[in-house]
Amino acid sequence: VGAGTEAKADTQKQPFMRLNHGLHLAYCTNIHRGETWRETFDSLNSHTLAVRERVCPKKPFAIGLRLSNRAARELSEPAALLEFQRWLAQKDCYVFTINGFPFGLFHGARVKEQVYLPDWTSPERLAYTNLLFELLAKLLPAGVEGSVSTLPGSFKAFHLNPDAVKIVRNNLWRCIERIAHLSEQTGRKLHLGLEPEPLCLLESSGETIHFFDRLRAEHPRDPRLAEHLGVNYDTCHFAVNFEEPQNALPCLRHHGIKISKIHVSSALKVRPTAEARCALAAFADDVYFHQVVIRRPDGQRIIYPDLDEALASEPYEAQDTSFENLPEWRIHFHIPLHTPTAPPFETTNDHLLAVLDLLAENPALCSHLEMETYTWEVLPPELKSRSVAEQLAAEYEWVLPRLAERGLASP
């Protein structure tokens, strides 16, 4: 759903809606399998067009494209790129953002820590990201900014020493130089967004600010940093980390950090009753990391790299502990935005809505919104819609009225 385009917020109740303030809204296609370009293109034809038909059948439809390294290289072939450009024009779709976090396989096998490889110490990560920007510059409609999101440097468990972190900064700066050159060459406004995530090199607003301060000290008074590197603010990740958007977002902006994109996403939160722990087992899969951040009533925080480890290691609370005195668990599991809350589960949608409140107060904060619920294949059956297209349409039907309530969309 793009700026000035329309979408059906709810086919039964809501009229078409138009996004305001130059906003662009899409779902991220990393929910679909597709490691080759042909597989990715097939998913656009079979799934994305089905979503478009339900949500926005008669106006331009925005796509948040996920490309693996292999798919990006295959799409860069002139014939493939021309075919895709023609397809976008024919189907009245457009790409404004690319998810460049997962480099390789992202579905159907163990991903876990592999999603962080190659990290930003690697020339492969730099070359891949540069290629994504070269493709995006050729796909963007006139007058639309382009963003690519990427991993926040590396994963803490890889134990990067200071020299390795310096390599991360150096490679990111090389990417900034390439983005700046492309922007000047093409007249496009392009920016890269680091996506903080629990247990990564950057997992909090504080760590992110410190990292940018180091970059700024290494490249003093160079405007390219602020113009071309920022943060992809994933509302699931920041909520899992117990950050409050009223603090995190203004703090990032105060330190001159661009909000490149906002991932509209939601996490699980529970109080660990015996019932809740039993129910949580259904969310412990063999594909993705589901980091768990636990905050005790005294404010102490404990982080587990994965849900199964938290369930196995965290002691049970005494049976006579009152519900209010139980710790709170927040689980990095992207659940559908429209998921109804029912005991023992809650969601972090309150964090997401607070971000939308801030966006309504200052629409210039960010123009790129991307729903990212990539966990379709590993969702417990009771949370799945009948098809992935129906689930995605339901997410639009949840988001659009909430944008409208805040003046970010209108009939």
Language-model segments: what does each one mean?
Residues 304-305, 309-409:
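Flexible, acidic glycine-rich loops studded with aromatic residues
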Residues 28-32, 66-70, 100-103, 151-155, ...:
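Active-site beta-loop-alpha junctions enriched in small/polar residues
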Residues 2-4:
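Residue-identity detector for glycine
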Residues 182-315, 326, 335:
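Acidic/histidine-rich catalytic cores of soluble enzymes
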Residues 109-230, 240:
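Active-site acidic/histidine proton-transfer and metal-coordination neighborhood
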Residues 13-143, 147, 174-177, 223-228, ...:
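N-terminal pre-domain/capping segments
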Residues 73-77, 108, 158-160, 203-207, ...:
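A short acidic (Asp/Glu
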